[in-house]
């Protein structure tokens, strides 16, 4: 008599994130997507960040929750810092090496526990760039690994070319060298990711990103929050520099995540009640200028004043996000001039995805961070580009010169100038009225259609996700227990 065998356990993928909302959010979205395709996902970050997630998500540690065809759970490790030492947790120079020292040990222990105690061995590790040492852990344990790159493919190429000395970059003696990379437009010296420039004061950020570039050869997949048609030339070029298929565009990631029916992940941990949507409903179509500079970029109050008076002079209605400062940088909260306040709505937070998809929004004044860039492009919203540093200056080049969905207001903090109100008003008029505004909107709507096609069933991003899941050997599964069991893992490391 033949014994009845248990259904195979789905491949177990462990996602390890740097603690921080801008890092956790995209990786959680990826985890949700992978779970929906039939994988067992364990999302891991530090205990200090776990406390915040428990409050917002009401999650239970190590408890499996069904998502689509698979499962998602959370696990956390102690970062080894005193509970009240927030100063170290917000200082990258201190936190990064400490987290690597502690994290390597803790992640190895977690992998061991899942293998020996719950009989759910980890088949793949995925990290985001600020914890690139996860690739070393995977190599030590002989587990395949992948990375989620949360900037553009163009920025990935710039860092890759810089690290491997493939073309000339600005130096201390020649700071104004322009950079030409195959598959990309010529980048002026102030259009490359600014951390690469020798004059950048952010050398610690350059080092942490280069640490991931150094480890790319250890990964079998590089997920990128972009889509094929948006960056086709550079995606094709970068794919020739690595193993075939290693570059996997999965974007727009926030739109991909919406394709999953059952959402157990409240991505924004600080999300209050959204005060914006009812107000937007009361505004005419294409009448509101949305203004937000992200969670990290900080403008001087004098610049905020000039932007505010520029909005007033352009005679446009605005929705402006003025955030409470949460980063421990002792920055004062921005204040808008009294005479401006009656022209629009000021909020501390809003759901940017929902705002950008609202028909009342005419344009987006943005710092050009990649999340904001992707959300604007894939929502069909023209932009007024006010980049500051890092990848933002390169993202602005693409919106203005390549995709032709934006106009320029600044070249970044290296420009060292106060953009006057007259210039602000001129750019706002350009993007909201007249022939240029019509052309920008037409281009933006084209990219919105391309983004929707990419995430649709059978679209380029959907296919890239399916190929990865197939690579892991996912099979239809039965119920997975939270405790130990005798299931045999489907798939094999040898397939990688």
UniProtKB/Swiss-Prot annotation:
GO terms for molecular function: sinapate 1-glucosyltransferase activity. One of its GO terms (cellular component) is cytoplasm. An anthocyanidin binds at residues 23, 390. Disruption phenotype: No visible phenotype under normal growth condition, but reduced epidermal fluorescence due to reduced content of sinapoylmalate and hyper-fluorescence of trichomes due to accumulation of sinapic acid-derived polyketide. Expressed in roots, cotyledons, leaf veins and trichomes. Its EC number is 2.4.1.120. The keyword Glycosyltransferase applies. Induction: Induced by the auxin indole-3-butyric acid (IBA). Keywords: Detoxification, Glycosyltransferase, Transferase. It comes from the Eukaryota. Changing residue 396 to T: In brt1-5; reduces sinapoylmalate content in leaves. SUPFAM superfamilies: UDP-Glycosyltransferase/glycogen phosphorylase. InterPro entries: UDP_glucos_trans, UDP_glycos_trans_CS. It holds the Pfam family UDPGT. One of its GO terms (biological process) is anthocyanin-containing compound biosynthetic process. UDP-alpha-D-glucose binds at residues 352, 367, 370-372, 375, 391-392. The active site is at 23 (proton acceptor). It is an enzyme of class 2 (transferase). It catalyses: (E)-sinapate + UDP-alpha-D-glucose = 1-O-(trans-sinapoyl)-beta-D-glucose + UDP. Belongs to the UDP-glycosyltransferase family. Ectopic expression of UGT84A2 causes delay in flowering increase of indole-3-butyric acid (IBA) level, down-regulation of the auxin-response factors ARF6 and ARF8, and down-regulation of the flowering-related genes FT, SOC1, AP1, and LFY. Sinapate glucosyltransferase (SGT) required for the biosynthesis of the glucose ester sinapoylglucose and subsequently sinapoylmalate and sinapoylcholine. Is the major SGT activity in plant. Plays an important role in sinapoylation of anthocyanins. Sinapoylglucose produced by UGT84A2 is a significant source of sinapoyl moieties for anthocyanins. Indole-3-butyric acid (IBA)-specific glucosyltransferase that catalyzes the glucosylation of the auxin IBA, but not indole-3-acetic acid (IAA). This is UDP-glycosyltransferase 84A2. The gene is UGT84A2.
């Amino acid at each position: 008599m033949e014994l009845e065998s248990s259904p195979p356990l789905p491949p177990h993928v462990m996602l390890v994130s740097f603690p921080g909302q801008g890092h956790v959010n995209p990786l959680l979205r990826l985890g949700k997507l992978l779970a929906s395709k039939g994988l067992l996902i364990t999302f891991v970050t530090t205990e200090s960040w776990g406390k915040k997630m428990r409050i917002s998500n009401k999650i239970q540690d190590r408890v499996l929750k069904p998502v689509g065809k698979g499962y998602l759970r959370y696990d956390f490790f102690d970062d080894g810092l005193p509970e009240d030492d927030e100063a170290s947790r917000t200082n990258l120079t201190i936190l990064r090496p400490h987290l690597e020292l502690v994290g390597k040990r803790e992640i190895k222990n977690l992998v061991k526990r899942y293998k020996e105690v719950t009989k759910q061995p980890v088949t793949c590790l995925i990290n985001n760039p600020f914890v690139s040492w996860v690739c070393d852990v995977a190599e030590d344990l002989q587990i395949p690994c992948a990375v989620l790159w949360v900037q553009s493919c163009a920025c990935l190429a710039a860092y890759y070319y810089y690290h491997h000395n493939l073309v000339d970059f600005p130096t201390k003696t020649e700071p104004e060298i322009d950079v030409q990379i195959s598959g990309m437009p010529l980048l002026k010296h102030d259009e490359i990711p600014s951390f690469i420039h020798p004059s950048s004061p952010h050398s610690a950020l350059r080092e942490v990103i280069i640490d991931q570039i150094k480890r790319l050869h250890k990964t079998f997949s590089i997920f990128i929050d972009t889509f094929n048609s948006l960056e086709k030339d550079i995606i094709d070029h970068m794919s020739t520099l690595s193993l075939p298929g290693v570059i996997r565009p999965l974007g727009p990631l926030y739109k991909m995540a919406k394709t999953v029916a059952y959402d157990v992940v409240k991505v924004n941990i600080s999300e209050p009640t959204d005060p914006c949507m009812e107000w937007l409903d009361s505004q005419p179509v294409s009448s509101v200028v949305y203004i937000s500079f992200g969670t990290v970029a900080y403008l001087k109050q004098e610049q905020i004043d000039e932007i505010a008076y520029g909005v007033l002079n352009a005679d446009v209605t605005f929705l402006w996000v003025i955030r409470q400062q949460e980063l421990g940088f002792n920055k004062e909260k921005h204040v808008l001039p009294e005479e401006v306040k009656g022209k629009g709505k000021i909020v501390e937070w809003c759901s940017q995805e929902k705002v950008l998809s609202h028909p009342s929004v005419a344009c987006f004044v943005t710092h050009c961070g990649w999340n904001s860039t992707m959300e604007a492009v894939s929502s069909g919203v023209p932009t007024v580009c006010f980049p500051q540093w890092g990848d933002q200056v390169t993202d602005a080049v693409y919106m203005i010169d390549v995709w032709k969905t934006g106009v320029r207001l600044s070249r970044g903090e290296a420009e060292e100038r106060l953009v006057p109100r007259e210039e602000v008003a001129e750019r706002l008029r350009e993007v909201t009225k007249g022939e240029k505004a019509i052309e920008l909107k037409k281009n933006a709507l084209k990219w919105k259609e391309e983004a929707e096609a990419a995430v649709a069933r059978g679209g380029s991003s959907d296919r890239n996700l399916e190929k990865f899941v197939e690579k892991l050997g996912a099979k239809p599964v039965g119920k997975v227990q939270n405790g130990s069991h005798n299931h045999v893992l489907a798939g094999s490391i040898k397939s990688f």
